Amino acid sequence: MEIKPSHDIDLRSDTVTQPCEGMREAMARAEVGDDVNGDDPTVIRLQEKVSGLLGMEAGLFVPSGTMANAVAIRTHTQPGDELIAE
């Protein structure tokens, strides 16, 4: 039996997606800011919403699980500490 790939949904990467016209319009209208300086209103609202949902004082958005793990490790260790991770 031959399995043919579906062309309706392609989850390989966000680089192969094509936004529809509505998505492009939403991106053009979106508020923008510099998240590095804590000035992006969208990221600020996301962090506030999620921290509120979880009953936490504050939140920190990171774009990947790998980055979240790195932040956690750096938070709990000092330079020169050793860590064994699986």
Residue spans of the language-model regions?
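Pyridoxal 5′-phosphate
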Residues: 2-11
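Conserved N-terminal alpha-helix of the aminotransferase class I/II PLP-enzyme fold
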Residues: 19-65, 86
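Conserved PLP-anchoring active-site segment centered on the Schiff-base-forming lysine
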Residues: 75-86
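Short polar catalytic/cofactor-binding loops
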Residues: 14-18
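Glycine-rich helix-loop-beta junction characteristic of Rossmann-like nucleotide cofactor-binding loops
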Residues: 51-53, 74-77
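Short, conserved alpha-helix that lines the donor NDP-sugar binding/gating region
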Residues: 69, 73
